[in-house]
């Protein structure tokens, strides 16, 4: 196959607890990743060299782009001499904490293995993914909810999907991840709840009393410094949602709804000012 297209879905974080800062400067964390049906589309065509086009002119398509980096890393690892033209239809906002760039990189690794007809062991692909970014392994390997630890690369498939409708709102501001890590309020010395057990209670028993445990350590500093993000949080909290949270380091905020009608109403209200996505209950990546 010399040409095909793939979807690259975004994610939200159900809880994000920063547990330590390593000697190399990276922070360790615990979180639950959940996919949402907000996706980019990537087209791959075999060619002599690696090149890229993007529908969003604000996104660089040079060697700093994660898709280009993924393609060249795979080339170098396997010795493949072929190239590819990558066309990215960018829908997922960047600087939003939704993992769009990481998802695009994971899609590139998987797609180029298929395009170039190469069989790379999953453990080797995982190592390439980790070098590209902490969220890349999730998009490479998982379909539904997953527990993540380490810098995000230690994954456990929970074999679950969220039983709530998800409305995700992009407040039209970008939060630099490096800034968020530099400024969040550190609380390393504290007990960390068992997120895996709690998310199973949420999904199997609909025990919404445990929602309060799923805190995001970036939330307070992001809401403090970005009033529009706080405004979105407050509007969603007043819309009948069962849970509202920042995703990743922001700026996107999501809300979970038991009923589809409430989710649709909230999505319509927020779409007058912001880019939004609504994901149905039970969603899993293809």
From Swiss-Prot:
It catalyses: 4-CDP-2-C-methyl-D-erythritol + ATP = 4-CDP-2-C-methyl-D-erythritol 2-phosphate + ADP + H(+). The keyword Glycosyltransferase does not apply. Pfam families: GHMP_kinases_C, GHMP_kinases_N. InterPro entries: GHMP_kinase_C_dom (IPR013750), GHMP_kinase_C_sf (IPR036554), GHMP_kinase_N_dom (IPR006204), IspE (IPR004424), Ribosomal_Su5_D2-typ_SF (IPR020568), Ribsml_uS5_D2-typ_fold_subgr (IPR014721). It comes from the Bacteria. Keywords: ATP-binding, Isoprene biosynthesis, Kinase, Nucleotide-binding, Transferase. Its EC number is 2.7.1.148. ATP binds at residues 93-103. The active site is at residues 11, 135. One of its GO terms (molecular function) is ATP binding. The keyword Membrane does not apply. One of its GO terms (biological process) is isopentenyl diphosphate biosynthetic process, methylerythritol 4-phosphate pathway. Pathway: Isoprenoid biosynthesis; isopentenyl diphosphate biosynthesis via DXP pathway; isopentenyl diphosphate from 1-deoxy-D-xylulose 5-phosphate: step 3/6. Belongs to the GHMP kinase family. IspE subfamily. Catalyzes the phosphorylation of the position 2 hydroxy group of 4-diphosphocytidyl-2C-methyl-D-erythritol. This is 4-diphosphocytidyl-2-C-methyl-D-erythritol kinase. It comes from Chlorobaculum tepidum (strain ATCC 49652 / DSM 12025 / NBRC 103806 / TLS). The gene is ispE.
